[in-house]
Every structure is written in C-alpha cells, then in structure tokens.
Amino acid sequence: MLKTYRGKVVVSLAGATVTCLGFLLFLSQHQRIQADGMQNESEVGLRSLQSLGDSETDDGAQPEQNAKKGFSAYFSKLTRSRREADKPSEAPGAATDAPPAEDISADDIFIAVKTTKKFHRSRLDLLLDTWISRNMRQTYIFTDGEDEELKKKIGSHAINTNCSAAHSRQALSCKMAVEYDKFIESGKKWFCHVDDDNYVNTKTLVKLLSNYPHTQDMYIGKPSLDRPIEATERLGDNKMRPVNFWFATGGAGFCISRGLALKMSPWASGGHFMNTAEKIRLPDDCTIGYIIESVLGVSLTRSSLFHSHLENLQQVSKSEVHKQITLSYGMFENKRNIINMKGAFSVEEDPSRFKSVHCLLYPDTPWCPPQVAY
C-alpha cells in the first residue's frame, strides 16, 4: 500500500513539473514578442527623429548634430501640439445645417450693452438707430448717468448702475455685477454682453445659441490673446497662487447659458463679483473667465463670429458680413479699423459702417436707400 501511495505522489509531482515548465515556456515566448514590439516602436520613433534632423540639416552636418536638431524639432512639435490641444473648442458656425438642440427666439436672450454717459450721443444713438431698433425687448443698456432722452427711447431698459464713469477695472466690474444680477432677475435663457461699439446680428446669434441647451454649461466668445492669461490669485493671509485661464474679450461680446450663470452665483451675485475681481486684480471680462474656467472648470467655447476693435476688421470678407454675430470699429495700427464693404453710405457718412451693415441685413429700414448694390 505504501508503494502505491509513493507511486501516486511521484506521478503527481511529474505532472506538476510538466505544467510548470509549459507555463514558463509560454511566458518566455510572450515576453520575447513584447520586447520585439517595443524595439520596433523605438526604431520607428528614432527614425522619425532622425528624419526630422535630416530634413533640417545640411549634407555636411555631423550625425550628432542631426540627432540634436531632430530631438529639438520633435519636442517643439510636441509643445505646439499641446498648446493647440489646450485652446478653447470651436463653436459650430451659426449657419450650420444641424438640427437645433433647443428652439429659442431672440426673446430668450438678455443682451447687455455696457456704455458710459459721455458716449450716449456719439456711440449709443448709432446703435439705437440700427440693431437695437429691431431688438428693443431683448436689449438692456447699462450706463453710469441719468439720461432722460435715452429713457424716452428705451424706457426701463436704460439702467443707471451708479458706478463710476472711470474706465478702471473697479468701474467696469461694478457695471458687470449689475448686468449679471439683472440677467438672473430676468429669467431669460442666455446672457450676452457687448460694448457700445458693437453691432449685434441677432439672427445669427439665435442660430448659434440654438446649438446648445441653455441648461448646459456654455461660455461662448472669442479670446483676444493667443494663450491663456496669467494672473495671481490672492488667497488671504498674504498668500497667493498663480492661475491661468482663457477669457472671451468683452470688446467682441460673449454669451453665457443660464445653467452656467446660476453656478457662478457665489462669486458673481450681489457684491461678490467685485470682490472676485479684486482677488485677481483684472477687469470685468477677465474676471468672468476666471470664475468660469479657473473656479468652475468650464472651458471657453471659441467662436470666430464675434469681432472686436482689437482685431483687423478688414479681414472680414464682404460676402461673409451677414454671417457674423458681432462687428466693431475703431483704430488698428494707427489706421481706421472698419468693415471694408461697399454700402449704402460713404465712409464720411457712415464712418463705423454700421448703417451700411444694417441696410444690408434689413433693406426695408425706412432710412436705407432703395436698391443698393453691395
């Protein structure tokens, strides 16, 4: 019986040994395949680097120099790629054929126009005669002084913020704080801010915003910088930390969904907006970007359909004017910066070109000359 038991033990040990050897053989083969694959990938990467070096050096250069240049070009390319990846996502064009995410009308939009009393006649009257005349119900003018003539034209939508008339970050942030609170009170779906040197095409604005549910976190506009802005956040107790974020320039206009605006409340409602602006010591539009991107972690959605006087407006094609959402005017590199278009009026009669743009979009306007060729 003892012999039988020993025989069984020997058989079991032999079987286990064979199984173990088989597993080790399989593992060895698998590791060899992985190593070969890694070697192939390394060779492909090295060839890519070498090709970069070869393409950028002369025939007489040393191999070591080629490799250095190859690595330098490779990592420069990586840096550019990362920078591109960090840029805000692009909004679809307003004329997209995709079905709207939400059916909205101009009445769902709260358009805030920031101005100052000294520009009521020179800038604001032009807007009242053009695009605001078609959008009285949607437009609210935020200024810093009483104006009975303005009230006669737009009634309670002329809002005296009682903020300073200075063009300081505190005064600008004061007006933005009032804009935000009035929007929340309105119950409208979208908040859009523009300046008193912007023409707003509400038709294309409605088309763009209809691509997104107003309950979704949306921050849409155009940066004036080609990189995130760098700032210092003051944390209290003399502690500070660096922050960087994208922001949409207020000079081109930007829009915020109601869903996102409500989330901004702890940092924007009441007097909180001005306190937040002081934390980073930057103007109103930068503070909006700080709250949305740096605090709430929502990315800016870039749209090329918004335009400010900070860009070369001559580059806006005449044939594309009707597709834009906002336009502007001013000076660029010491030259008149306006939309370059043949319109209903001469440049002397219409230096901003807003009247000509308006007659292009609304030829039935009583003061527009009939049958104008654009």
From Swiss-Prot:
The record marks 83-84 as: Cleavage. It is a single-pass type II membrane protein. It comes from the Eukaryota. The active site is at 285. The gene is lfng. In the embryo, expressed along the A-P axis of the neural tube, within the lateral plate mesoderm, in the presomitic mesoderm and the somites, in specific rhombomeres of the hindbrain (even-numbered rhombomeres) and in the otic vesicles. The keyword Hydrolase does not apply. Its cofactor is Mn(2+); Co(2+). A soluble form may be derived from the membrane form by proteolytic processing. Keywords: Developmental protein, Differentiation, Disulfide bond, Glycoprotein, Glycosyltransferase, Golgi apparatus, Manganese, Membrane, Metal-binding, Neurogenesis, Notch signaling pathway, Signal-anchor, Transferase, Transmembrane, Transmembrane helix. Residues 30-374 are lumenal. This is Beta-1,3-N-acetylglucosaminyltransferase lunatic fringe. GO terms for molecular function: metal ion binding; O-fucosylpeptide 3-beta-N-acetylglucosaminyltransferase activity. It comes from Danio rerio. Its EC number is 2.4.1.222. The keyword Transmembrane applies. It is found in: Golgi apparatus membrane. Belongs to the glycosyltransferase 31 family. Glycosyltransferase that initiates the elongation of O-linked fucose residues attached to EGF-like repeats in the extracellular domain of Notch molecules. Involved in the correct formation of boundaries in the somites and hindbrain. Required for Delta-Notch-mediated induction of hypochord cells at the lateral borders of the midline precursor domain. Glycans are attached at residues 40, 162.
